[in-house]
A protein has these predicted regions:
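Bacterial Sec-dependent N-terminal signal peptides
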Residues: 1-8, 22-24
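Hydrophobic core
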Residues: 10-19
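Sec-dependent signal peptide cleavage junction
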Residues: 18-34
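N-terminal low-complexity, Pro/Thr/Ser-rich intrinsically disordered segments
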Residues: 30-52
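Structural signature of tandem-repeat unit edges
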Residues: 58, 78-99, 111-131, 140-155, ...
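A short, structured beta-strand/loop element
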Residues: 59-75
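Consensus positions within tandem repeat domains that build extended binding/scaffold surfaces
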Residues: 104, 133-136, 157-160, 179-182, ...
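A structural signal for leucine-rich repeat
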Residues: 230-232, 381-385, 405-410, 429-432
Length: 452
């Protein structure tokens, strides 16, 4: 039997520096030395996989799989085959439990030199894993992730599975937290499910953004907090359901709301109704709430609605008609963007707050009416492709009305219809184009026309 040499940390470091610089310490292989006092932060390697020591107490400790910097390098024999992360590894007389997946551990990056990079077809995560760190599976080529029975996983950090080729995943009951953009841009993801006894409480911002194959999702009753833009630019969802008994959220015909319905969070992009009316309780349309919808032609917003969020109707490509209520006070940035079929828009009297580029790229918009109490319009209020725009009606009569030099980026053929000489003067001094400005008399009998 080969005698094992025991070295002090100092001696081992000197020998390694002299003969194999920058190489990790190997464990449990015939040619490797075993460190007697493995420390927190040490990098060890076993079966070609690197681990980083997280804790040590006597002869037991914990490690993360992966060094936290570079991906695991799989061998040719592992390519396209299932791979299981070990529950424990042994280093000399010490036993370490694998409790975390390190950042970048199972990320995939094509080699810039053209060298073949091998990767397994599926990865099984043992019950001992409690955390998947940021970008742990970024760009992963595994089609399936499997969690062992009795999983203790509590946290999936930001971007853990983003840009992956994952096709399906069933998340364990123990999971409590899903980080920002955790599954975003995983374009092949078709099935994502939660355990019926899920403990999940928080899903962070854009966790399921930019997905093109996920058709349905049911949120567990345990969820208490959802981040913003959860389904931003996701193009495949037909309905989002909420498990019965959830105290924070509700689903009505596949549309996701806060429990009291005051916030409409998401109207699925592939929900195939051509018309829709928001519930009477709704006060806010969340950012990206109707984005990428492919069917909706007519939308009636309820009285009592106060706020339309950023990109709320972005790329709702079939939307032809929308009714905005007098209760509306805020329309955020790019709320109307890429609405290819919208022909007319009437902004009600009481809107006080506008984001930049609130209307951008409306190629079939012919007429815009700006309500009576709207006193100020921001930069880039109306911009982008506006090839069909013929007229803008400004109903305001106040001497406080103001616009900026770059409020209207519009064709010169567009005519303004205003209620007073003051409004005309405000426009004349700020327009960069020579648009007709027509002052409409109260009795509608006589009109005065001027060219700015």
């Amino acid at each position: 039997m080969k005698k094992t040499t025991i070295l002090s940390l100092t001696t081992a470091a000197v020998i390694l520096a002299a003969y194999v610089p920058n190489e990790p310490i190997l464990a449990d292989t015939p040619s490797s030395e075993v460190i007697k006092e493995t420390k927190v932060g040490s990098i060890i390697q076993q079966n070609n996989i690197k681990y980083k020591v997280l804790t040590v107490e006597g002869n037991i400790g914990t490690v993360q799989v992966g060094n936290g910097v570079t991906p695991v390098e799989f061998e040719a024999g592992q390519d396209g085959k299932p791979f299981t992360i070990p529950t424990k590894i042994t280093v000399g007389d010490k036993v370490f439990t694998v409790t975390e997946v390190a950042s970048q551990a199972f990320s995939y990056y094509p080699d810039e030199t053209g060298r073949i990079v091998y990767y397994p077809s599926s990865i099984t995560i043992p019950s001992s894993i409690k955390k998947i760190q940021k970008k742990g599976f970024h760009g992963s080529k595994a089609k399936t992730i499997i969690f062992d029975k009795g999983s203790q996983l509590e946290k999936i950090e930001d971007r853990a599975f983003d840009f992956s080729e994952l096709e399906e995943i069933e998340l364990p009951a123990s999971l409590e937290y899903i980080g920002t953009s955790a599954f975003s841009f995983s374009q092949k993801l078709k099935k994502l499910t939660f355990s019926s006894s899920s403990k999940l409480e928080l899903i962070s911002h854009e966790a399921f953004a930019n997905l093109s194959n996920l058709e349905k999702l049911t949120l567990p009753k345990s969820v208490k907090t959802l981040g913003s833009n959860l389904f931003r630019l996701t193009t495949s969802l037909k309905h989002v359901d909420v498990e019965e008994g959830n105290e924070s959220f509700a689903s009505v015909d596949g549309v996701l709301f806060s429990k009291d319905k005051t916030q409409l969070i998401y109207y699925p992009s592939q929900k195939n109704d051509e018309s829709y009316k928001t519930p009477k309780e709704t006060k806010e349309l969340a950012s990206y709430s109707f984005n990428k919808n492919s069917y909706l032609k007519k939308l009636e917003l309820n009285g009592g609605l106060e706020k339309i969020g950023t990109f709320a109707f972005a790329d709702a490509i079939k939307l032809e008609e929308i009714s905005l209520p007098n209760s509306l006070e805020t329309i955020e940035r790019l709320a109307f963007y890429g609405n290819l079929e919208l022909k007319e828009l009437i902004l009600p009297d009481n809107v006080k707050n506008f984001g930049k580029h609130v209307m951008n790229g409306l190629p079939k918009l012919k007429s815009l009416t700006i309500g009576n109490n709207i006193n100020s319009l921001p930069s880039f209020f109306l911009s982008g492709v506006l090839d069909s725009l013929k007229e803008i009606h400004i109903k305001n009569k106040s001497t406080e009305f103001s616009v900026k030099k770059d409020t209207f980026a519009i064709p010169e053929t567009v005519k303004f219809y205003v209620t007073s000489e003051h409004i005309k003067d405000v426009l004349k001094s700020n327009l960069s184009t020579s648009n007709d400005i027509i002052v409409e008399k109260v009795d509608n009998i006589k009109q005065e026309t001027d060219v700015a």
